[in-house]
Swiss-Prot record:
Keywords: Elongation factor, Protein biosynthesis. Gene3D superfamilies: 3.30.70.60. The lineage of its organism: Archaea, Methanobacteriati, Methanobacteriota, Methanomada group, Methanobacteria. Promotes the exchange of GDP for GTP in EF-1-alpha/GDP, thus allowing the regeneration of EF-1-alpha/GTP that could then be used to form the ternary complex EF-1-alpha/GTP/AAtRNA. The gene is ef1b. This is Elongation factor 1-beta.
Length: 88
């Protein structure tokens, strides 16, 4: 099996959420071997999505454990996989 890089779009619960604290929570929630980076994406009305890049095995489950772990956080409204690319 090979690895894939996936981008998860994480939508905070509200614009009032402390993004720096949320970024730290996300880093601590995702397996350190999988985590790559977090980028901010302005959505509108003060809401900023976080695009979280992870690298996972393309086997069974893939991004699902990370998606479920992030979705379980109170500060997060939704988690969506927006891109998946096989690494060479």
């Amino acid at each position: 099996m090979s690895d894939v890089a996936a981008i998860l779009k994480v939508m905070p619960e509200s614009p009032e959420i402390d993004l720096e604290a949320l970024k730290e929570t996300i880093k601590n929630t995702i397996d350190a071997d999988s985590f790559e980076r977090i980028e901010e994406e302005p959505i509108g009305f003060g809401l900023i999505a976080l695009n979280v890049t992870i690298v996972v095995d393309d086997g069974e489950g893939g991004t699902e454990p990370a998606e479920e772990a992030l979705a379980a956080l109170d500060e997060i409204q939704s988690v969506e996989v927006t891109d998946v690319r096989r690494l060479m």
